[in-house]
Amino acid sequence: MPSDTTVPDEYADAALFLGMNSEDEGVRRACKAFFVDRLDGRIVMSLEQVGRCDDIIWGFSRELQDAYYPFMDNLHTVMDIRRLGYEEADVLHATGTELPRSLPVHERLLLGMVRDRKGLLHTASPRLAATTGFAVRAVTGADGPEARFPEPLEDLYQQSLALRVPAEAL
């Protein structure tokens, strides 16, 4: 009997994406390493998680937004990020009894999507990282030299660091 060698789609949430600009240096470096390591691969983000990134960034001054967005825009262009909307089955999983009611609705919707589509969620969210029984992997510390994007993306990333996201926003 052949074994299933299908690699699950890797999902990223807003906490992981914005974690690249975290005030916490360990989180920042780990999240950046995640994206650098997958720059030539593919990840999936729900449309809502992409929108959550914008919602948080829009809370900063126009000057900080202008420093941040060139990096984000370029990363979304050069990296294969599949942005997907929810399907009915995702919502049904999110509203079912198997997902913890202690999680906010947006996180239950994301877990429902990942579970329904048999993916693997990578996150910097302490709440999601503490959730057991689901395909969730918390980003871990990055040892050694800091990972670097190829130029000109690295330069744009360094400029984006004018904006730092507080840990509680992740």
Walk through the language-model features, giving the residues of each:
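Short, well-structured N-terminal submotif of metal-dependent ribonuclease cores
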Residues: 1-45, 57-66, 147-170
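Short His-Asn-centered micro-motif
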Residues: 12, 46-47, 122-125
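Short amphipathic alpha-helical segments and helix-helix/interface helices
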Residues: 31-36, 69-72, 109-111, 129
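Active-site regions of enzymes building and remodeling cell-envelope glycoconjugates
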Residues: 133-144
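A generic structural signal for short hydrophobic patches within well-formed alpha-helices
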Residues: 17, 50, 128-129
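Active-site neighborhoods of divalent-metal-dependent phosphate/nucleic-acid chemistry enzymes
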Residues: 80-132, 163-170
